Amino acid sequence: MKWIVALLMLPAIVLATPSPDSAAKNRLTPSDWRYATQKVAAGDSAWLGAVPDLALKADRKQADQLEEALATALPINPKGVLAVLHTLDAGSWPEMSGTNIVCTRMVVRPGKAASDYYKATRWALLSEPGGAECLWNLEGVWEEVNQQTNNAE
């Protein structure tokens, strides 16, 4: 009996999770938005492709979450994130920023997490032919943060 109930609930559970297409077309609940940003942060190509559509309806807080997710995905799927950044840089989005913010936001505060992120992202961008601008921004901010840290000591 329990199996029958579980099987009957399965379609409702599956339908409750948004897809990139449905997320781009429909209004998202806060839990759907969290799900979408988690998928973007994981570097999921389908969800990366939905970012420009999500950016159109994002408020400032949601845009910040999307930028954070893109930055997290950068060392995981640099090619996919760079394609999204290229689209964002070429367009006009109410609240979203592109390369200048996403490529640098994880290294603006010194520390081990920033250092680890810098190393992984730098390596990923060196392997990606289209990553020069992002790499240039990343390295510039990283050097500036390190110089400020050294001057403060």
Please state what every model-predicted region is.
Residues 1-4:
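Positively charged n-region of N-terminal signal peptides that target proteins for export
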Residues 17-65, 150:
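N-terminal secretory signal peptides
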Residues 7-8:
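Hydrophobic alpha-helical transmembrane segments of integral membrane proteins
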Residues 45-48, 60-153:
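Extended alpha-helical scaffolding segments
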Residues 11-16:
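N-terminal signal peptide c-region/cleavage motif recognized by signal peptidases
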